[in-house]
Amino acid sequence: MEIYGFTLSEVGRFTDLKFQLAPTPTHTSNVTVFVGNNGAGKTTLLKSLATSLSWLVARIRTEKGSGNHLAAEEIQNGASSALMVITVFDDSQAWSSIPDADPDDDLFTWGIARTRQGRKSTVHSSLTDVSRLAEHYRKELTADDKASLPLIAYYPVERSVLEIPLKIKTKHTFDQLDGYDNSLNRGVDFRRFFEWFREREDSENETGISDTALAEISIKFGYDSDVWKTLSNLKASSRDRQLTAVRSAIAAFMPGFTNLRVQRKPRLHMAIDKDGVTLNVAQLSQGEKSMMALVGDIARRLAMMNQSLDNPLHGDGIVLIDEVDLHLHPKWQRSLIRQLGETFPNCQFVLTTHSPLVISDAKDVLVYVLNDGELHEHNGLYGLDANQVLLEVMDTDIRNSDVQKRLNALLERLQDGDLETAQKLFAELAEELPDGHIELAKAALLLRKLELRRA
């Protein structure tokens, strides 16, 4: 399942906006990224996509389910009505395998409309196709209670890593449909993640050997003993497939982090090994917890919704993430899109970012620059350094504007052969800028050449 196209009419800043999402004929990646200044409308786009998709989730759950509605405050100022229309491509239907089938049979289009009170309606909601698509998945689930469902999730900028609970007061079920719980309105929920993880691990330990027991055996007999090797192999064979998916996803995004687990001594908590050192998850940095919670939540939902797949991370889905670079170290920002595609290869990702590192290190990513209510596709970003992306795509100076003006003035004086003024400007900048400043080092070479010519 993929979002094929989207239209916004009189919604927020957008009077009439139409766009496609990757993959497209010219962008084979499954990732689309929106960039733009604060207030440009990036969040409005993602929230509108989430609102449209909420109707599919609601009608997969129940035949007459209702999704989220357009709010009155989302209607553009001065307009009477607003409309959002989404087209989804889904080839999981039985007729998709028929040789002469119409390709349009795989496209489903529905619209959500809202009119201000006291105004005459000029647009109307249309929900026939979303009901038809949802009915297909309900039939699949009726015929096979292990049938896979598509993940649909939205992680807003307000997502936060909540306090990890020590006790679970009420138990929940975790079947395929539960993968949709709060998937479009809450973001990361460590409480539900902890509850799910503990339940799965309890089941895993009942059929295998706990990590605690294995650790005690290693202390007594050693890692090279036949006893430890036999029990370790037995544990590996009894690993829970869903937990394995979550652990492997976190390890892929966070090198050096392994063996996520629940520990019960000295008190109940989630633990993880970081570079061989066991830590309480609560001890991790905000960036580490944010990454773990985001990746863990996506993997958990995929695992729940694809129980019959050998690798649940290969499940189908659509994931929307606002400000995907939030709290992340630049090193993780640079590899983020590549890891999303490699770890979750059948999910379509729609992201927003303020980071040049996110969009300059992945091939075939579809990048839209948002400005004054309009979208402009920007190609050829792969391999550009962060400064080029800042200047060419994000319309931001690569350094302090005053410093840049003075560097430009220095280079102009050097080109004009004005040695005295150039020496003065260079001395002033050398006093303020750190040793090893690249542009100043280049200017120093040019200044030395000019001095030698004048000697």
Which stretches of residues belong to each language-model region?
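A structural signal for well-ordered alpha-helical scaffolds and beta->alpha junctions
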Residues: 130, 134, 148, 190, ...
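P-loop NTPase switch/coupling surface
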Residues: 1-205, 414, 434-455
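Amphipathic alpha-helical surface "interface" segments used
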Residues: 70-73, 108-111, 216-226, 269-275, ...
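Hydrophobic, Leu/Ile/Phe/Ala-enriched alpha-helical segments that form helix-helix packing faces
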Residues: 49, 53, 134-144, 246-254, ...
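Extended helical coiled-coil dimerization/tether regions that scaffold
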Residues: 2, 87, 182-291, 296-314
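Switch/communication elements of ASCE P-loop NTPase nucleotide-binding domains
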Residues: 1-63, 259, 264-398
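RecA-like P-loop NTPase motor core
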Residues: 2, 141-143, 338-342, 357-455
